[in-house]
Every structure is written in structure tokens, then in C-alpha cells.
Curated annotation (Swiss-Prot):
Record field: catalytic activity: L-threonyl-[receptor-protein] + ATP = O-phospho-L-threonyl-[receptor-protein] + ADP + H(+); L-seryl-[receptor-protein] + ATP = O-phospho-L-seryl-[receptor-protein] + ADP + H(+)
Transmembrane segments: 124-146
Keyword tRNA processing: no
Protein name: Activin receptor type-1
Family statement: Belongs to the protein kinase superfamily. TKL Ser/Thr protein kinase family. TGFB receptor subfamily.
Length: 509
């Protein structure tokens, strides 16, 4: 860019016509000529002596005024004689004794040009041409500089290309005829994270074909994609939610999160499509969709209800617990647990998704990793201590207790769809009867903290032993005092006990 700025004045200097040596310097010991002198400046004289003679015509108050005379100073003659004729004045100059005697200056007429005019127009044309040329050259230099800047910016957005090398060659290789299960099983022994090695992740990402959009939200879109004939889910984050993509990618690539009730991670990548950078998170695909969508269309029997809630509790317990050893993991709190962030699998179990707000804690270092994400959880599922801002943000157990509150609300959503004695409630979100569809922070704070309301328990639940047990369990998740709430492990054990008692009842029958 600096080179382009330095070149511009040089080009203009080259393009401008350079004056001759005769114009630059006055003559040494100039020769004087006798000239005819007519007009007011001559007085009583009819001749004068000077370096140049002239004859002029000007218009003054509508009258033509003719004058003749001489220039005694070289520079004065140079300035005047070089001036092109105008509609109001014309000057003709010459050198030689009495040379202006027979010269009569004429004003320019339409269609007639004078040598001075031609030179003037030529000079102006050359100046304009040189400026246009310089501007075009500068525009070209700017274009090249912008292209380089864009390329450099793209490289910055893809830091793994620099660290691990580009993968263009890998795409043409046979990753090969391996299935995703083969790749993921192999990756368990090759690192501490849940995902594939970075290069394989990027290879898989570049080979995915997007087939259909299966969901849209505030933070992006979810697509069904295909990789070597297998369905995968591709979550495309919006640019404003880059922090969530980065957090989830970081967590999956550094923590061993492989569990049947946690959404299976495959790969993560930054890719450029339609001249914009897209943030991809590639996971297992579950065609039955989210628990939120599933419950609106499906009623549950006792077995399927318990299978769903027990699988969610198992996934949450796995997140909350810290596992030590080479295949270990830190304790993790989800912070945005809700029915929309839980997916239903073909076997009737569920898996927890969306770890963009997750918090990690390691007991050995006592380090709390909250991440750097300005996004907050879903207001409808916020615990009282979050709504009244009394949560201890430097205590990891506080975040786990927030998850338990949200789990109790999900448990209530599921239990409403369980049929007992031929009766079942329509699906409704928590607090549907006391807050609007998109409640504000203040709406939820008043209902949960000030009025201390909880979701309504229908009377018909108390005629069914399973629903009665679930009602008791969810109430223990909704204590106003966070430390009084159950732990995820305690909930899992209680649900397992309820499930076992149901199996025993079937056996006895």
C-alpha cells in the first residue's frame, strides 16, 4: 500500500508536460526590438523598445480597445503571451523590429482555434489523463491489498490449517470405507477428548452433504447431512454465537464425554460457504428430534416414561461427576437443561445436547472454568437463585443445583404425557399458565422468587404409584433453598428403584 502511494506523485510528474529550457530561464543580455506603440500607455510616443512586441484587443464597456506596445521585462512578456485568447481579451506577441506593425489581435470565434489554445487544451488533457491513470493504478493496488488482507483473515479464522497443515490432500484419500462408529471407537484410544483427531474431523466435515434443515433457533440452524451414506446432524452456529461453538468444540475435544445419554460428538469445523464463514458442529443424528417436539405428538406409557426420565438423569449424573484416571473427565454443569436440548433416540432413551454454556470443575486443581460466553440460559427454566441473582458464581455446586431445578421441570413435562387410567394432559411448557410465551426475566422472577409458585401437579397423578413417586421427586428438585435439592446421582438411584419396583410388579402379576 505504501508503494502505491509513493508511485502516484511520480506518475503525475512523468505525465505532465515539462517546459522547455527557453521557458525556464530568461535570456542573458537579451536583444531589444523597436516596436510600434499605440494606446493610452504610450503617451505622446509612437514607438517603444523592449524584448517583445505585442498587439492586443480587449472589450471595455462594450467597446473594442486596440493597443500595441512592447514588454521590457522578459517574465512579463512570457506570462502575457502564453495566456490563450478569451472572449474578452486577445494578445498577439512577436520578436523583431516593428514586427507588430501589421499584426491585429482578434478575439476567438466559434470553430476557430489558436496555437495557444491548442497547447492549453493539450496540457489540460494530459493532466486529466495522468490523474485518471494514477487513480486506476491506485484502485488496482487497493484491490490487490484487500485481496491479500481477506486471504490473511481467512487463514486467521482457520488456525488449525496452520497448526496441522491443510487437508486438501486428505479429502481425496480414502478415510476410507470406515464407518463413523469405527472412527469413533478408534479415537477413544488415541487421545483424551471425545471427538476424532483434528485432521480427520476436518476431512469428515468437508465430505458432508447437507440434505435438509430440520430445525432453526435463535443461535443457528440444524441440518440433516450425509457422510458416506450415514446420517449426521450438522449444527450451524450463527456468527453472534461463536462463543458457544468454541466452548462446545473445546469441551468435546479435551474431555472424555462418551456416554450413551450424552449426544455423540463427531467433528467440528470452520468452513466458508457463500462468501461467509460458517461454524459447524457435527454430531450423531437422531431422527425423532427433541424431547420438546416428541412430547407434543406422543403420549407415554409407564415404561416409556421411566425410560426417558431415567436416561436423562443418567446423562446428567455423568456430566456432574468427576472421573479420575487416564480416561477421566472433570465435573461438568450444563447450565441450559430443557426439553429442547434433549434428544430422543430410537430405543426410547434420551441424550443431553448443547453444551455451549457448560461449566467445568477439576477437584485436583480446584479450578472453575466458566468459559467466556455472554449468552445466558433459558429464562423459563432458570432457578430462583439465578433469577434473584443470589447464586454463588464462584462455587461449582451452585451450577449443579441449577441443573437439578431444570431437571425437575423437564420431569414435570414428561410426566404430564404419561397415560394413567386412560387420562393424559396435553403438552405444555413449565409455568405455561402464569407467564407469557416468551417470558421476561422479571416475569419469571415474580412467579418463582416472589410468589414462589411451582408447576401444578394434577390430582389424577396421585391415583398412580409411578406418577406419585415422580411428583414427590420433582418437588425435591424445586426447593427454594438450593442446597436442599437432590443430587443427580440420588435422582438416578431413585428412578432406578422406581423402575425396578415396576419390573417386580410385572413379574408378580
Amino acid at each position: 500500500m505504501v508503494d502505491g502511494v509513493m508511485i502516484l506523485p511520480v506518475l503525475i510528474m512523468i505525465a505532465l508536460p515539462s517546459p522547455s529550457m527557453e521557458d525556464e530561464k530568461p535570456k542573458v543580455n537579451p536583444k531589444l526590438y523597436m516596436c510600434v506603440c499605440e494606446g493610452l500607455s504610450c503617451g505622446n510616443e509612437d514607438h517603444c523598445e523592449g524584448q517583445q512586441c505585442f498587439s492586443s484587443l480587449s472589450i471595455n464597456d462594450g467597446f473594442h480597445v486596440y493597443q500595441k506596445g512592447c514588454f521590457q521585462v522578459y517574465e512579463q512578456g512570457k506570462m502575457t503571451c502564453k495566456t490563450p485568447p478569451s472572449p474578452g481579451q486577445a494578445v498577439e506577441c512577436c520578436q523583431g523590429d516593428w514586427c507588430n506593425r501589421n499584426i491585429t489581435a482578434q478575439l476567438p470565434t466559434k470553430g476557430k482555434s489558436f496555437p495557444g489554445t491548442q497547447n492549453f487544451h493539450l496540457e489540460v488533457g494530459l493532466i486529466i489523463l495522468s490523474v485518471v491513470f494514477a487513480v486506476c493504478l491506485l484502485a488496482c493496488l487497493l484491490g490487490v491489498a484487500l485481496r491479500k488482507f481477506k486471504r490473511r483473515n481467512q487463514e486467521r479464522l482457520n488456525p488449525r490449517d496452520v497448526e496441522y497443515g491443510t487437508i486438501e490432500g486428505l479429502i481425496t484419500t480414502n478415510v476410507g470405507d470406515s464407518t463413523l462408529a469405527d472412527l469413533l471407537d478408534h479415537s477413544c484410544t488415541s487421545g483424551s477428548g471425545s471427538g476424532l483427531p483434528f485432521l480427520v474431523q476436518r476431512t469428515v466435515a468437508r465430505q458432508i452433504t447437507l440434505l435438509e434443515c430440520v430445525g432453526k433457533g435463535r443461535y443457528g440452524e440444524v441440518w440433516r447431512g450425509s457422510w458416506q451414506g450415514e446420517n449426521v446432524a450438522v449444527k450451524i452456529f450463527s456468527s453472534r454465537d461463536e462463543k458457544s461453538w468454541f466452548r462446545e468444540t473445546e469441551l468435546y475435544n479435551t474431555v472424555m464425554l462418551r456416554h450413551e445419554n450424552i449426544l455423540g460428538f463427531i467433528a467440528s469445523d470452520m468452513t466458508s460457504r457463500h462468501s461467509s464463514t460458517q461454524l459447524w458442529l457435527i454430531t450423531h443424528y437422531h431422527e425423532m428430534g427433541s424431547l420438546y417436539d416428541y412430547l407434543q405428538l406422543t403420549t407415554l406409557d409407564t415404561v416409556s416414561c421411566l425410560r426417558i426420565v431415567l436416561s436423562i438423569a443418567s446423562g446428567l449424573a455423568h456430566l456432574h461427576i468427576e472421573i479420575f484416571g487416564t480416561q477421566g473427565k472433570p465435573a461438568i454443569a450444563h447450565r441450559d437443561l430443557k426439553s429442547k436440548n434433549i434428544l430422543v433416540k430410537k430405543n426410547g432413551q434420551c441424550c443431553i445436547a448443547d453444551l455451549g454454556l457448560a461449566v467445568m470443575h477439576s477437584q485436583s486443581t480446584n479450578q472453575l472454568d466458566v468459559g467466556n460466553n455472554p449468552r445466558v440460559g433459558t429464562k423459563r427454566y432458570m432457578a430462583p437463585e439465578v433469577l434473584d441473582e443470589t447464586i454463588q458464581v464462584d462455587c461449582f455446586d451452585s451450577y449443579k443445583r441449577v441443573d437439578i431445578w431444570a431437571f425437575g421441570l423437564v420431569l414435570w413435562e414428561v410426566a404430564r404425557r404419561m397415560v394413567s387410567n386412560g387420562i393424559v394432559e396435553d403438552y405444555k411448557p413449565p409455568f405455561y399458565d402464569v407467564v407469557p410465551n416468551d417470558p421476561s426475566f422479571e416475569d419469571m422472577r415474580k412467579v418463582v422468587c416472589v410468589d414462589q409458585q411451582r408447576p401444578n401437579i394434577p390430582n389424577r397423578w396421585f391415583s398412580d404409584p409411578t406418577l406419585t413417586s415422580l411428583a414427590k421427586l420433582m418437588k425435591e428438585c424445586w426447593y427454594q433453598n438450593p442446597s436442599a435439592r437432590l443430587t443427580a446421582l440420588r435422582i438416578k438411584k431413585t428412578l432406578t428403584k422406581i423402575d425396578n419396583s415396576l419390573d417386580k410388579l410385572k413379574t408378580d402379576c
